Amino acid sequence: MASDLGSSLTSIDWLPQLTIQASIKGSQQNSVGRKGPGSPADPSAMLSKEEAAAHRDGKPPYSYANLIQYAINSAPAKRMTLSEIYRWICDNFPYYRSAGVGWKNSIRHNLSLNKCFRKVPRPRDDPGKGSYWMIDSCPKEDITLPRRKRPHPDDEVSQDSFEQEVNKSPLSSASEVSMPQEATQGHPMNNNSPLPTYSQANPTQMPPDSRAPTYNNNDCYKFSFSESTFPDLSCSFRSLYHSLLGKQGERGDKDLYNSMQSKQVLPPVHSEVQSSSCCMYQQNSGAAPSNLHPHNVPSISGLPPSHHQAQHQQPPYLPQQQMPRPPAPGMSLGLPSDWCSNIDSLKESFKIVSSLDWSSVDLSQFSDLMESLRQAELKNWSLDQDHIASLCDSLSHLLSTTGLLPQNHGQPPSCQAPCMPPTTSSACALRGGKPGHNMAVNSYGQNQPPPVSCGHTFTVSSGYPTQSQAPPTYSQQGRHPHRALYPPQRPTLRYPQSSDDIQDDFDWDSIA
């Protein structure tokens, strides 16, 4: 049993006999029969006839680099093409004639990767194909660059913190407050009207040696909120964004229907029909009592048809931007000029904008605000100083467009808008392109338009109920209602004809 274990492979009796000198001698004896795979030791070595005859029957004990060296040195010009090297190896060692094509790939790899072989282009006066290969007696050694030691992660953190402390200066902190130019270019304003100017009541004190900020004195970027207020502002903007999307979703198929109707070219409609489909809210804060008296408004029946049509006729297919409905009567419409620098005024603006009725408003008018909110949604509402400044600027554009923000400091918002005649392009679009749908009906069963009003108005969609009669106009002096006089004749209505509708020319009023 012991003899079996001693003769087995697990026996380690040979371990004490192993020495370094014996291993070196054994490796030298084994290396005599076959050359190493590296570069040849002697670039000018040649294969003798005796060695070629001794290894003619079997596989030669030479590496591919030695075979290439012997082939090139056998040529008189000390150069050979790849096909000539193949031919020389097959002629001197018949083993490679039936060895397949794998050895040829090894020859090509040695020529390309070994530095002692150099490729020489064929001269123009030398006919034939392929370049020549020669032996380079002094090959260029690759200069191995020293590898840079990778720093420890703790060292990287300490170095970054040190650089941040060095770069931290009053000049850099002042530049952080300003809005960069790339952020302002990413949110362009799609309006041709100039933005209202804002004055800063308490400007931020800057060091005397610092540079001037990148914003103008009239821009809305002159605010510096602490980072502790960023989560509250992000939540406010997020609730505003979701509120706008939710109220826009209530429109449903109305947007699609309105977009289809806006693309159709409708025929011109009578002036009395166009001027009769607008319901307005009138603000009497900045208007004089004489301007509100019904006697100062010219009667519609007293104007000639041509003059009346020239004043009020407007093609119904022209695009008309709709403003949102006004907030509740108890909500304050005025905001201070420095609202963007005060956190309380900014929160108040969120309440005012959220209280507006956006169900009938196309948000493409405020693409800058929606784009800023969409970018914030993509960032998961983790906003920085620059993004909040861009959102405040877009919100300022929204408030100034809707008239909630005064455009001039000395006048209220109600005095800013000029007195314009009412138009019904947006109202006709909401009714599907058929004018006269919301016209008032008098006691004789005839249609009559509502009274013409002037002042800062808000266009109301068709969701509000219409009165069966013309609403009375009140004056501030006596508070007595006065009904305007309208022509008793019925206006001629022309509807867009389609292939499915049948034109009805019968006068149904004659039966009544």
UniProtKB/Swiss-Prot annotation:
SMART domains: FH
Polar residues bias locations: 167-204, 456-478
Basic and acidic residues bias spans: 48-58
GO CC list: nucleus
Chain segments carrying region Disordered: 25-58, 143-213, 284-326, 448-512
Cell compartments where the protein resides: Nucleus
One term of GO molecular function: sequence-specific DNA binding
Record keywords, A-Z: Activator, DNA-binding, Nucleus, Transcription, Transcription regulation
GO biological processes: positive regulation of DNA-templated transcription; regulation of transcription by RNA polymerase II
Acidic residues bias locations: 501-512
Residue spans binding DNA: 59-150
Biased composition (Low complexity): 304-323
InterPro entries attached to this UniProt entry: FH_FOXJ2 (IPR047393), Fork_head_dom (IPR001766), FOXJ2/3-like (IPR045912), TF_fork_head_CS_1 (IPR018122), TF_fork_head_CS_2 (IPR030456), WH-like_DNA-bd_sf (IPR036388), WH_DNA-bd_sf (IPR036390)
Pfam families in alphabetical order: Forkhead (PF00250)
Reported function: Transcriptional activator.
Protein name, per record: Forkhead box protein J2
Organism: Xenopus laevis
Gene (UniProt): foxj2
